[in-house]
A protein has these predicted regions:
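A hydrophobic, small-residue-rich beta->alpha segment in the mid-to-C-terminal subdomain
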Residues: 157-200
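General structural feature for long, well-ordered alpha-helical segments within catalytic domains
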Residues: 93-99, 140, 195-200
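Short peripheral tails and domain-boundary helices/loops at the edges of structured domains
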Residues: 3-6, 123-152
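Glycine-centered flexibility sites
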Residues: 89-90, 100, 117, 124-126
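Short, Lys/Arg- and Gly-enriched loop/turn segments at beta-strand edges
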Residues: 111-121
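Active-site lining segments that contact anionic ligands and/or coordinate catalytic metals
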Residues: 102, 137-141, 170-171
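Intrinsically disordered, low-complexity linker/loop segments enriched in Gly/Pro
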Residues: 1-98, 104
Length: 200
């Protein structure tokens, strides 16, 4: 990486402007919210069990970090899979959630439990193919503040995202400027026809 550009040894001479953003960002759910997710997603699975409509908790594949004993077993049996975004945020994969963005998350537990991860150098909208991003390591710098009773005050149950005003330009072009001076050197006042001729 060099600034906002990256290159690859596999494609020499090509630089690519990225839009660095977290694929995953959100607050912790409370136990009631977690139980609601597991219930409604299991109900969806039950409508067509072989279609892969959702993924229930899976104790066999759960990564529980440093948890041990009963706490580990309970979390593995109840923990929501992180693929879908939910009311708390989660795996949102919004490519425009980059420098200058604002996010408003509902908070369900004391301390919010804000977490950020799955950093992408760039991706398409939604990372819909599960491999549509350029993954990266990095640090995230952000300012966090609390809107006291914000969920009740603004009636929100889901995150609100205000995307970054910074978007890379992937078109490669040059611009020819035309001015209001004709071929003989005569000056005109804001003459678009003369300016157009000079640009062409």
């Amino acid at each position: 990486f060099k600034g906002m550009f990256t290159s690859s040894r596999h494609i020499p001479g090509v630089n690519f402007a990225g839009l660095i953003h977290p694929g995953l960002i959100g607050c912790l759910p409370d136990p009631k919210m977690l139980a609601l997710w597991n219930e409604r997603e299991q109900n969806l699975i039950d409508t067509n069990p072989t279609a892969g409509l959702a993924n229930p908790p899976s104790a066999g594949t759960a990564h529980m970090g440093r948890l041990k004993g009963e706490a580990k077993a309970k979390a593995a049996a109840e923990g929501a899979r992180t693929v879908p975004p939910r009311e708390h945020g989660g795996n949102c994969d919004i490519k425009d959630l980059s420098r200058g963005s604002k996010v408003f998350f509902p908070v369900y537990v004391d301390g919010a439990g804000l977490s950020v991860g799955d950093l992408h150098f760039s991706q398409g909208d939604g990372e819909i193919t599960f491999c549509g991003a350029i993954e990266m390591a990095g640090w995230v710098h952000m300012k966090v503040s609390i809107i006291k009773d914000g969920m009740a005050k603004y009636g929100i149950k889901n995150p609100i995202f205000k995307p970054s005003p910074i978007t890379p330009q992937y078109n490669d072009y040059i611009i020819f400027e035309g001015i209001s001076v004709d071929e003989a050197g005569k000056q005109y006042y804001l003459d678009v026809n003369v300016a157009y001729r000079q640009a062409c």
